[in-house]
């Protein structure tokens, strides 16, 4: 949680430093690091022998509190330069992220693990295709900016790539500093480095100009 707050502030500070003349780009950069931890991080954590229960706890916690943290973060950091409908965004985030996460927990508890052991693997392929569809459909909002690429947008892309990689590095360094075992170090790396970009794309498309989707 603490690392997440630090990263949001760093994203805002560095975004403002390099791209402060364009509030839409700064908004997109901050939004990128305000969304919850990516659900797909759990898949990578499992593949590399990470701590599954810890990963699920981090992912679900960040998802459940996101209807509050995302709008408030954007309002606090960008409220002076970008118009933000906080109540409407909170409502949409609750239905899009928090409620599905809570329902998943409830179903798994009521079925005594059947949801995780049987239902989740069965639905996983379809969910991946649907996720790709959501990302693709919402990414059309930035097609104009990709087709008309300029030096500033190339700089934004390079910045996002570098900042994203740094998330994995910071997670690793913090885990090593705390002398965490391999499984928890792996979990820290992926949960610090991966964000739910599909939800970010939906938020950007619904509430902001198309250029916000680009970062």
Stretch-by-stretch model annotation:
Residues 15-23, 75-88, 113-117, 142-155:
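Membrane-interface helix termini and inter-helical loops of multi-pass transporters
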Residues 21-41, 58-63, 72-95:
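Interhelical loops and loop-helix junctions of multi-pass membrane transporters/channels
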Residues 119-188:
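Transmembrane helical segments that form the transport core of multi-pass membrane transport proteins
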């Amino acid at each position: 949680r603490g690392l997440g707050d630090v990263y949001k502030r760093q994203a805002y500070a560095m975004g403002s430093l390099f791209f402060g003349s364009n509030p839409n780009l700064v908004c997109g950069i901050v939004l990128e690091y305000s969304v919850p931890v990516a659900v797909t991080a759990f898949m990578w954590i499992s593949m590399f022998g990470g701590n599954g229960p810890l990963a699920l706890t981090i992912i679900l916690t960040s998802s459940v509190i996101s209807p509050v943290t995302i709008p408030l973060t954007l309002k606090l950091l960008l409220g002076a330069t970008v118009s933000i409908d906080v109540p409407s965004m909170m409502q949409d985030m609750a239905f899009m992220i928090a409620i599905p996460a809570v329902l998943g927990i409830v179903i798994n508890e009521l079925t005594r693990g059947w949801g995780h052991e049987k239902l989740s693997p069965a639905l996983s392929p379809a969910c991946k295709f649907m996720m790709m569809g959501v990302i693709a459909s919402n990414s059309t909002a930035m097609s104009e900016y990709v087709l008309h690429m300029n030096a500033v947008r190339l700089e934004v892309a390079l910045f996002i790539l570098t900042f994203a990689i740094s998330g994995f590095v910071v997670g690793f360094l913090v885990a090593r500093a705390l002398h965490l075992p391999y499984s928890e170090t792996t979990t820290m790396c992926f949960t610090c480095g991966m964000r739910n970009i599909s939800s970010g794309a939906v938020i950007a498309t619904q509430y902001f100009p198309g250029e916000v989707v680009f970062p």
